Amino acid sequence: MASPASTNPAHDHFETFVQAQLCQDVLSSFQGLCRALGVESGGGLSQYHKIKAQLNYWSAKSLWAKLDKRASQPVYQQGQACTNTKCLVVGAGPCGLRAAVELALLGARVVLVEKRIKFSRHNVLHLWPFTIHDLRALGAKKFYGRFCTGTLDHISIRQLQLLLLKVALLLGVEIHWGVKFTGLQPPPRKGSGWRAQLQPNPPAQLASYEFDVLISAAGGKFVPEGFTIREMRGKLAIGITANFVNGRTVEETQVPEISGVARIYNQKFFQSLLKATGIDLENIVYYKDETHYFVMTAKKQCLLRLGVLRQDLSETDQLLGKANVVPEALQRFARAAADFATHGKLGKLEFAQDARGRPDVAAFDFTSMMRAESSARVQEKHGARLLLGLVGDCLVEPFWPLGTGVARGFLAAFDAAWMVKRWAEGAGPLEVLAERESLYQLLSQTSPENMHRNVAQYGLDPATRYPNLNLRAVTPNQVQDLYDMMDKEHAQRKSDEPDSRKTTTGSAGTEELLHWCQEQTAGFPGVHVTDFSSSWADGLALCALVHHLQPGLLEPSELQGMGALEATTWALRVAEHELGITPVLSAQAVMAGSDPLGLIAYLSHFHSAFKNTSHSSGLVSQPSGTPSAILFLGKLQRSLQRTRAKVDEETPSTEEPPVSEPSMSPNTPELSEHQEAGAEELCELCGKHLYILERFCVDGHFFHRSCFCCHTCEATLWPGGYGQHPGDGHFYCLQHLPQEDQKEADNNGSLESQELPTPGDSNMQPDPSSPPVTRVSPVPSPSQPARRLIRLSSLERLRLSSLNIIPDSGAEPPPKPPRSCSDLARESLKSSFVGWGVPVQAPQVPEAIEKGDDEEEEEEEEEEEEEPLPPLEPELEQTLLTLAKNPGAMTKYPTWRRTLMRRAKEEEMKRFCKAQAIQRRLNEIEATMRELEAEGTKLELALRKESSSPEQQKKLWLDQLLRLIQKKNSLVTEEAELMITVQELDLEEKQRQLDHELRGYMNREETMKTEADLQSENQVLRKLLEVVNQRDALIQFQEERRLREMPA
Amino acid sequence: MAKQYDVLFRLLLIGDSGVGKTCLLCRFTDNEFHSSHISTIGVDFKMKTIDVDGIKVRIQIWDTAGQERYQTITKQYYRRAQGIFLVYDISSERSYQHIMKWVSDVDEYAPEGVQKILIGNKADEEQKRQVGREQGQQLAKEYGMDFYETSACTNLNIKESFTRLTELVLQAHRKELDGLRTRASNELALAELEEDEGKPEGPANSSKTCWC
């Protein structure tokens, strides 16, 4: 080891440089180093080689080795790939710096300007495996010893910037601080080049710098001229970040991090948070880095209630503006949330200070996210070409909960540098742009799972990173408008037009719809469709349509005794329950023929779902593809209600509805009585008019989409995820649904209430083999209790039986228990617990434990484990929820527990990211839906009121309305698809929790267990198996749908 | 919606506790390996889609607890499997001996035409080896199975063995698959198939035995 008082000042400067934690210190020590070595700074790669040659210092060797290894990758051509390229990089954020480093390695001259003078962003970024590897290869561990030593992989923006800055400086990037880029200065005449407009007063040498590549990494708010930005709007989303001082005490190191909990799959956590603190969140993340970093999404209502926001303003800018936010209340809010999430184990939670010396807590809005339409452009004037590329937030604003910020940012930085290399190779502007755009298309789909596995191979070449790469996905032809020759008139991009044109051709006009309806109902006795009003009044036409699309549900003869209302009601319900087509208008309105627009909208659902299916064979048809997701969710919701109904069965009610019927409480007005025949539809929740596009049907009742929300938290409700309280008649999300009348306290959120149809259930049914959709005449199932017969009882019973089982796919015989008796299965399940009383083999193999973690830790030679390993205190179990119940047993298996925790964290992180992506898309869909509704309302008003307008105009409007309806339908479908994925995540989370709970029991001394323990252990195991079976049901559902799609 | 896969198969991993069934699965589906052992409770499954001869096969791989106390539970999942991995640990003679018992369980509970493959896992632990390669081969031959020595730790033969079993299942069901396809394209919907399977007797029965 060298003595601290080294004789060589250059060595001291190098040490200071490596250790420097402030931007100024980095720069000053680097200048000192260069001076001491007699090297001029900022001279590109040659500067690096000079420093390396001059500084013969052991401590620097390992760093040189790393940088040399990177620089020797063939793609850089020994730093000769871009020797004649001059680049200007704007912005020293992580992405700007990362791009600058790549450009320097390519041998380009790189000048970087940054308007700030220090790095002060504490916020912490999640790292993907490839970014970890990438940063390690650049010497991250050398500059920052704590790099990725925690249970989760992340780094504060500040540290990331510091280490990249150091690398950039070493590689000869010329960096100017406190200089703001304000625009481009085109070449004034032939022979001159592009320059930058900079403020304030840049050094003369910088002002006259002419460059041929501009990389803009100046953040989301700054996008160079010529680029168009697209806004992705979601529903209002308020994020809150908070940084607390990390004193690195033993207590603090023990507190487990939270890679993310999201409401959509873990309602319980948020419910208890709400109860304890009044804080209502969508999600929360906690990373332990330089600071204790928390980030969460808060609901507006609770911010208002807790006085964080002064008043409810519709403009988000104003809502979260300085004048409307109470800083002290925001601090209290963030602290309380952090305290709750960490079980108060972080002590007094003192805020870290932000750049201005104030507590580092901020509320921000991510309702809208910006995304550049294109990632690069070329401008040409007087023969001088300038290549412009975007990286970082100005290319795609990251959605923070995904933790994609730095990963996609780095990928884009690599792609931009690759583009510069291609540019330097002499590829034509259009070719370069087309390649870059092809890569840009891939960017938003990237995830750690779908990238190349071997992160060690990642390099500049896109082929090393993206599997299934097609650099010609975008053709040079398509990027012509990105090549801007200033001499021409500026060509305006026509952004939306091709889209609207497409939908025009794809939509079906009313005539086509009428024709289709005629075709579908042809031959049915007594049906003759000629219009969208009176033809449907007797209900027969609708029955005929349903019968044609789904034969076997009803024999025409059965219709004989039915009245028009009954027939129409039947058709509406069967279409919803069996075909997944939700009503748009009430049976009364259909009969009265008073709402032709509504009927058109309704029938167009059928048309778009079935138009591609041929029925010549007269066999069962299914909606071509996706509507089945809606169908599935509908079934799920109904089975959920049935479960509830069962619970309520004891409570006597004056007018008992059939059990199979989704129960509406007496409080809710009965539709048929209150609705004048032919009257326009009104929302049953707010009583206001419902325009066609706005109609949202639940159990035959119509609401505004926005009215159908949880009575407590006002969250939008989705099929499969809500319940109606029989007492007050209000709708609730499963989290807020009052539980008091449930007989059994539900330990696992909504497990019991969410009874997914499982294949296993078929074992419990004496008649499991009847595939419900195919039976012509349903066989009454003896398992169902006798109940009051109503006219459609056979159908109801049929439907009921279909709810519990997913019909087995045609590929396999229906599952049968090994000895074909459900009792046997149950008994064997019971007997399997008998063995639990005797000391069974420990769940671990001791020798495996010993070699446990060493391998997992690090292959990296300079790994310094600075953080003490989390001690084995019971507190740690808190994240593993129920494991806390028996700390004694846990301490015996430290390695087991640590690994389990680590794995759990990783899984949790994946699930969280997935959930957030879904949540975001759901919010976007909702926002788009609102826009469609507004548009549709306008059209509908025009159509209804202006009876004087010419027919031609009316027809045009009608077609437009139809188009909107179709758009809405496809959004509804996408929403349903996403909700299925949510179900999957939800189940995975439940499985994880049950698994942990069960392990808690299993590791207890068998002799210490009471009878009650054994019983609940038994119960948890059963629940676990049930959840696995439910997950399986989802897989089967997908398979079933695939099989249905096959003929198409 | 775009077609994401062509066919769905269910595979099943069985063998003594601690032979590395879960590790094999994690390595195959997530390319992850954790060396410390956490025993599986009951059953679990993971999904993966692979390409076999241009056919996108989605496989649902059921992972079972090896511990005896779960066997009544796990056996219930045998009947739905089309392919089964019988796994032992090359460093455990006992786990190898037990393969016999596992095979007899398969005979009893799994469907007739189920495809089987023998796996000797932990092939990286050469110094602790108790079961010779030839022994594995011999046993596999006896039962007419394919045999692989694998290592989840070093990623040896993982993909190969999973692909192989999938291929075997695919071959065994090729006829039915083709049949299904043609029938489907003739718009004979699966309703008929389902009904066929509901019938205890009849011409459809032949296809049933293959499909179990």
Curated annotation (Swiss-Prot), chain A:
Residues annotated as domain bMERB: 905-1048
Low complexity bias: start-end ranges: 654-666, 772-787
Cellular component annotations (GO), alphabetically ordered: actin filament; ciliary basal body; cytoplasm; cytosol; endosome membrane; hippocampal mossy fiber expansion; intercellular bridge; midbody
Cofactor section: FAD
Pfam assignment, any one: Rossman_Mical
Domain LIM zinc-binding as annotated: residue spans: 681-743
Phosphothreonine: residues carrying this PTM: 475
GO molecular function: actin binding; F-actin monooxygenase activity; FAD binding; metal ion binding; monooxygenase activity; NADPH oxidase H202-forming activity; oxidoreductase activity, acting on paired donors, with incorporation or reduction of molecular oxygen, NAD(P)H as one donor, and incorporation of one atom of oxygen; protein kinase binding
Coiled coil: 847-867, 906-949, 974-1031
Region (Monooxygenase domain): 1-489
Known function: Monooxygenase that promotes depolymerization of F-actin by mediating oxidation of specific methionine residues on actin to form methionine-sulfoxide, resulting in actin filament disassembly and preventing repolymerization. In the absence of actin, it also functions as a NADPH oxidase producing H(2)O(2). Acts as a cytoskeletal regulator that connects NEDD9 to intermediate filaments. Also acts as a negative regulator of apoptosis via its interaction with STK38 and STK38L; acts by antagonizing STK38 and STK38L activation by MST1/STK4.
Name this protein carries in UniProt: [F-actin]-monooxygenase MICAL1
Origin species: Mus musculus (Mouse)
Gene name, Swiss-Prot/TrEMBL: Mical1
UniProtKB/Swiss-Prot annotation, chain B:
InterPro entries: P-loop_NTPase (IPR027417), Rab15 (IPR041826), Small_GTP-bd (IPR005225), Small_GTPase (IPR001806), Small_GTPase_Rab (IPR050305)
Family matches, as Pfam families: Ras
Top-level EC class as recorded in UniProt: hydrolase
Cofactor(s), names only, from the UniProt record: Mg(2+)
Binding, Mg(2+): 22, 40, 63
Annotated Gene Ontology cellular component terms: endomembrane system; plasma membrane
Position of sequence motif Switch 1: 31-45
Molecular function via GO: GTP binding; GTPase activity
Transmembrane segments: none
Region span, Disordered: 192-212
Sequence motif Switch 2, residues: 63-80
Family from the record: Belongs to the small GTPase superfamily. Rab family.
Summary of the function given for this chain in its UniProt record: The small GTPases Rab are key regulators of intracellular membrane trafficking, from the formation of transport vesicles to their fusion with membranes. Rabs cycle between an inactive GDP-bound form and an active GTP-bound form that is able to recruit to membranes different sets of downstream effectors directly responsible for vesicle formation, movement, tethering and fusion. RAB15 may act in concert with RAB3A in regulating aspects of synaptic vesicle membrane flow within the nerve terminal.
Domain notes: Switch 1, switch 2 and the interswitch regions are characteristic of Rab GTPases and mediate the interactions with Rab downstream effectors. The switch regions undergo conformational changes upon nucleotide binding which drives interaction with specific sets of effector proteins, with most effectors only binding to GTP-bound Rab.
Subunit structure: The GTP bound form of RAB15 interacts with REP15. Interacts (GTP-bound form) with MICAL1, MICAL3, MICALCL, EHBP1 and EHBP1L1.
Record-given protein name: Ras-related protein Rab-15
